[in-house]
């Protein structure tokens, strides 16, 4: 499953 990278690229 997805983590905090592919689902939230807001760095």
From Swiss-Prot:
Record PTM text: Isoform 2.1Y4 differs from isoform 2.1 in not being sulfated.
Entry-annotated residues carrying Sulfotyrosine: 4
Principal location listed in the UniProt entry: secreted
Tissue note: Expressed by the skin dorsal glands.
Keywords noted in UniProt: Amidation, Amphibian defense peptide, Hypotensive agent, Pyrrolidone carboxylic acid, Secreted, Sulfation
GO biological process: defense response; regulation of blood pressure
Entry GO CC: extracellular region
Annotated signal peptide: none
Modified residues (Pyrrolidone carboxylic acid): 1
Record PTM Phenylalanine amide, positions in chain: 11
Compartment(s) where it occurs, according to its Swiss-Prot or TrEMBL record: Secreted
Protein family per UniProt: Belongs to the gastrin/cholecystokinin family.
Stated role: Hypotensive neuropeptide.
Protein name as annotated: Caerulein-2.1/2.1Y4
